[in-house]
Amino acid sequence: MLRGIEIRGKVDKNVKSILTEECLTFLGELERRFGGIRKNLLQKRLDRQIDINNGILPSFLKDSDCKRATDKNWKCSSVPLEIQDRRVEITGPTDRKMVINALNSGAKVFMADFEDANCPNWENSIHGQQNMIDANNRTISFTSAEGRKYELNKQVAVLFVRPRGWHLNEDHLAIDGLSMSGSLFDFGCYIFHNHQILKNRNSNPYFYLPKMESHLEARLWNDVFVFSQNYLGMPIGTIKATVLIETILASFEMDEILYELRDHSAGLNCGRWDYIFSFIKKFQSYPDKMLPDRAKVTMTSPFMDSYVKLLIYTCHKRGVHAMGGMAAQIPIKNNEQANNAAMEKVRLDKQREVRAGHDGTWVAHPALIPIAMEQFNTHMKSQNQISYIPSSTAPNFEEIAKSLLSVDPVKPGDITEDGFRSNIVVGILYLEAWLNGNGCVPIHNLMEDAATAEISRSQIWQWIKHKAPLPDGKSFVTLQYYNRIFKEESDKLEKAHPNSKTLTDAIQIFNNLIVSPNFIDFLTPSCYKFVVDSERKTFSPKL
């Protein structure tokens, strides 16, 4: 093995085909050049959280070292023709059958997800990379246990890839004794193996970038792009990336984020569910910023509506796509009335997005594509509506800052026992699926990823901390209230799924997240440790 590079996962023919000596050398370069900067930025996140807990609220940057809204002259570089029209995009994990179905779905773009819709066990990570290579080579196929064969159509969606966020490690690969960045691993493997394939097809590498909290984190991605393009002999600007604005802090730095990535930008996306989670997390210490039941927080909530409007204005001012958020509904079988109601919600949501000025939107299931497509085809006659700027004058940023942070105080009835129980059940069920290797899970007729579990557990933690009012107006959410309902719901789940170790582990992880005196930033690292420890019991690492 190369000096200082250690594979800590099982080494088989699949691993060897991805982690070649040349690829490992490239990954080592990425980690050694950028890993330290990443860790410094993660420390800045912790420092920022302390400031917020101490009363220093987020605001727009007054003295940023990159041009902001006050400079109207710059625009991001143009994107290739094949991604000018992104009116409907489908997202999903990187397993072989899902990749084929998504590429064949009729959507304009498929975002293959190594992040929230993926459990990054070693097999998923390696097989996912191979599936990307085969997809770009147009050779990917799959035969089910029943003998059904899946192959690509002649016309397929454009492929985007979402690597893991900056906060996640790849524990199966160590550089100089330390786990590599999950972001750099996912990105590095993909760009190394696919850049030439894409060039040969007159296409480009496209990415979605998650979970950023500042323009400095966008600057790091840009530096990674520039280095990688130089290393691999690609012209600067070949890589294009859409940033998910899914943290409250990033919403105050959208202009700066676009500026940092201006040669590589393919716009911004409203990552609505993680945005809600981020709002709860960042304002964990603020009783006046608690949110009601998860189901009651919608895109028409004033703080969410302000975020959407600012994103569209900022993107179009800078000449890039403003992408709408996820519709997580899935078809409801054997209940036509419920299914029709669910599909009508999707229709209205997509109509709202396109009328607001979005250039495209996300769906989680192929059945939603015609519904979303109809709304965008009806209300957006051109490839996009980037030329539409919602206001002819610059917005009042002082007022926007207030609206981004403003929520109505929680009152009796906003938090219900049904909503409380739902958070517990959904959180545990998602964690159990994740521990079993599935990051994208159908629960209660919605396709859920990690964001839903994050909202569920963070709401409960915050409600307990601030003794949120219950519907009777006399009692409040307490640890004792949680313990009672948690025991009832976990007992039901264990009775329905006896002798399930992963369910027992999921219940333990969920409870640990709730009873921790300090808010735990992300739930996936806790789960990841279980996964890695379980894997290491079955093999001896190859050094």
UniProtKB/Swiss-Prot annotation:
Top-tier EC class: transferase
Protein origin, superkingdom: Eukaryota
Family classification: Belongs to the malate synthase family.
Name this polypeptide is given: Malate synthase
Cellular component terms (Gene Ontology): cytoplasm; peroxisomal matrix
Keyword field: Glyoxylate bypass, Transferase, Tricarboxylic acid cycle
EC number from the UniProt entry: 2.3.3.9
Keyword tRNA-binding: no
Gene Ontology biological-process annotations: glyoxylate cycle; tricarboxylic acid cycle
Entry's Gene Ontology molecular function annotations: malate synthase activity
Reaction(s) this enzyme catalyzes, per UniProt: glyoxylate + acetyl-CoA + H2O = (S)-malate + CoA + H(+)
InterPro entries named among the record's database cross-references: Malate_synth_C_sf, Malate_synth_sf, Malate_synthA, Malate_synthase_CS, Malate_synthase_TIM, MS_C, MS_N, MS_N_TIM-barrel_dom
Coiled coil stretches, renumbered: none
Keyword Transferase: yes
Pfam families: MS_C, MS_N, MS_TIM-barrel
Active site: R162 (proton acceptor), D449 (proton donor)
Pathway(s) it belongs to: Carbohydrate metabolism; glyoxylate cycle; (S)-malate from isocitrate: step 2/2
